[in-house]
Amino acid sequence: MSRLISALQLSISAAIIATSLPSCAVNSGPPPKAEHVLYEWYDDQGPGEVKVKINLNTQLAHFTRGDREIGWSYVATGKEGHGTPSGTYRITEKLEEKFSGSYGWLEDEFGNVTNGDAKPSTKVPPGQKYMAAPMPYWQRITGYGIGMHAGVIPKPGETASHGCIRMPKEFAPVLFSVTKVGTPVTIEH
């Protein structure tokens, strides 16, 4: 009888231990979703000018310092009808906080978005308000409103913006910290 009780106690103890260990616990929820790695950064802070090269076909940006690659990132450039212009540019303005003067959304008094693609000229119904789109870590490259900034990358490898170059939110401040007014930016197909 004491052997049976000892075996039962051992089984119960093993079950308690097994379910308390994260690797052994039974998870009744859905499996975790795989997420894209949106960027990699390995800047050595060595000599050389930082340069940005953006490929509109792959929606990838590559960064170099001198002749060394220092990182890459997914971007989201202009969707159909709002294409990002190819060409060679230089950063002409840097602002940590900026809001779009051209795009935003409408939201009701509870903060629910009622129109996710509004402009300042959009008629605002009673009880709602226009919210200008935030563009943190803004780096202007044209005189007509195109720049790089933090934003949502909804589907890595696909366009999504109104013409700007969106960078992953976690990465935009990293790039912002190593660029300067005058940093070259090349955009190509």
Model region roles, listed by residue range:
Residues K51-K53, L60-T64, W72-Y74, R90-T92, ...:
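Soluble periplasmic/extracytoplasmic beta-strand elements of cell-envelope proteins
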Residues S20-E40:
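Bacterial Sec signal peptide processing site at the extreme N-terminus
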Residues I12, I16-L21:
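Hydrophobic core
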Residues M1-I12:
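Bacterial N-terminal signal peptides that target proteins for export
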